[in-house]
Amino acid sequence: MKLLITGVSHKTAPVEVRECLAFREETLPAALADLKACEGVSEAVILSTCNRVEISLTTEDAVDPREIVDNFLSRHKAVSSASIGPHLYRHEGRDAIHHLFRVAASLDSMVVGEPQILGQLKVAYAAAKDCGALCGWLDGLMSRSFSVAKRVRSETGIGQMAVSVSYAAVELARKIFGSLTNRTVMIVGAGKMSELAARHLRRSGASHVFVTNRTHERAVDMAKLFQGTPVEYARFTAMLPEVDILIASSGAPHYILHKDEMQRVISARRNKPMFLIDIAVPRNIEPAINDLDNVFLYDIDDLQEVVNSNLRERMKEADHAELLVTEEVDRMMARMKVAEVTPVIVSLQEQLEQIRSGEMEKVRRRFGPFTAQQEEALEALTRGIINKVAHGPISELRSQAGKPDGAPAIAAIRKAFHLQD
């Protein structure tokens, strides 16, 4: 059996190449059926995301999996081997297993530690299962990759730290308030980043979202996204005493919130803490507001520094994750080696059982018939002898299976017991 993973990713190909090779979800069943129908192909999986397209195959030893993939791509995509060849990576055997485990664990992602790739792998796995393209060893390998990803996330902190500006805002809010349950959010402006930050805050327990914008219709539209309340722009400062978290991202060319206004807001809040997130450029909130007690103001640069710090920490965790992945690859390879000698072990056990059964039959003809109790005792005795005889060579077979120079020892056991290849 051969294992091959061929593909392109954000590391090897620009988006123009990746989009040429991408498979839409509705086209996967037909593509997988075509791939599975190729002579010598045992199993196949196609993973297609924004950042990578990968084809995983197991084939019979007699065929060339690289040629199969090249011909498949030429049938399904309007690309030539010459144009995509420089961007393709190909991993075989152990390297393919290592690559798959790294992809599942998000060590090969554009943002290391992001969880989306594992979900995308599971979708690809389900699609292959549904159309009968997975039914054997590759099926088990894919399942194992999910377990490896789970282990990496549980034993390292690779996915615990915010690495987007919008989520960094949520992380900081938690540090300020502890729990975000029942906190009130106001969005000033209708930018994408403020929408993402508000969405994260809502999912983290924020109870209500006010939205204001110079164009009131846009405030109404965004408020619907969060089951929130649109507020007239002229009234938003009057609403601030009710707000715990303010996200400012309006396109105003000047400050829309000044220190003296904020002083009145904090007094009205009886000095309860307030978190201000200014992700506008130019900034919306006067920086001097940060001098006030119980006010925590962060601008886009502050949030980016949090992200950069977290990315550095993630990369430290990634080193630990790489060690875990290598350990899991070693385990998988050991299992594969043992699986290779399983037919030899079965053949040995069958041969010894045949000898035992034949000798038992001779004893029955010569000294029988036996009582049920005698028969049971003889069966137990002879099976025990056979098991003891088999224990040594079976243990040696399993031991030698995991060694690069184990083939001569395995061949010697075959010869000693007259086992056929």
UniProtKB/Swiss-Prot annotation:
Q: State its Enzyme Commission number(s).
A: 1.2.1.70
* Pfam families xrefs: GlutR_dimer, GlutR_N, Shikimate_DH
* Keyword Cell membrane included in the entry's annotation: no
Binding residues annotated for NADP(+), in chain numbering: 189-194
Looking up SUPFAM superfamilies in the UniProt record yields:
Glutamyl tRNA-reductase catalytic, N-terminal domain, Glutamyl tRNA-reductase dimerization domain, NAD(P)-binding Rossmann-fold domains
Q: In which pathway does it act?
A: Porphyrin-containing compound metabolism; protoporphyrin-IX biosynthesis; 5-aminolevulinate from L-glutamyl-tRNA(Glu): step 1/2
GO terms of molecular function? glutamyl-tRNA reductase activity; NADP binding
One GO biological process term is: protoporphyrinogen IX biosynthetic process from glutamate
Superkingdom as given in the UniProt entry: Bacteria
> What residues correspond to the site Important for activity?
99
Q: Give the active-site positions.
A: 50 (nucleophile)
Keywords on this record?
NADP, Oxidoreductase, Porphyrin biosynthesis
Extract the InterPro entries matched here. Answer: 4pyrrol_synth_GluRdtase (IPR000343), 4pyrrol_synth_GluRdtase_dimer (IPR015896), 4pyrrol_synth_GluRdtase_N (IPR015895), GluRdtase_CS (IPR018214), GluRdtase_dimer_dom_sf (IPR036453), GluRdtase_N_sf (IPR036343), NAD(P)-bd_dom_sf (IPR036291), Shikm_DH/Glu-tRNA_Rdtase (IPR006151)
Q: Which reaction does it catalyse?
A: (S)-4-amino-5-oxopentanoate + tRNA(Glu) + NADP(+) = L-glutamyl-tRNA(Glu) + NADPH + H(+)
Where along the chain is substrate bound? 49-52, 109, 114-116, 120
Q: What is the protein's known function?
A: Catalyzes the NADPH-dependent reduction of glutamyl-tRNA(Glu) to glutamate 1-semialdehyde (GSA).
Q: What else is known?
A: During catalysis, the active site Cys acts as a nucleophile attacking the alpha-carbonyl group of tRNA-bound glutamate with the formation of a thioester intermediate between enzyme and glutamate, and the concomitant release of tRNA(Glu). The thioester intermediate is finally reduced by direct hydride transfer from NADPH, to form the product GSA.
Q: Family per UniProt? A: Belongs to the glutamyl-tRNA reductase family.
Quaternary structure note: Homodimer.
Q: What does the entry note on its domains? A: Possesses an unusual extended V-shaped dimeric structure with each monomer consisting of three distinct domains arranged along a curved 'spinal' alpha-helix. The N-terminal catalytic domain specifically recognizes the glutamate moiety of the substrate. The second domain is the NADPH-binding domain, and the third C-terminal domain is responsible for dimerization.
Which HAMAP family does UniProt cross-reference here? Glu_tRNA_reductase
Protein name in the entry: Glutamyl-tRNA reductase
**Native organism:** Solibacter usitatus (strain Ellin6076)
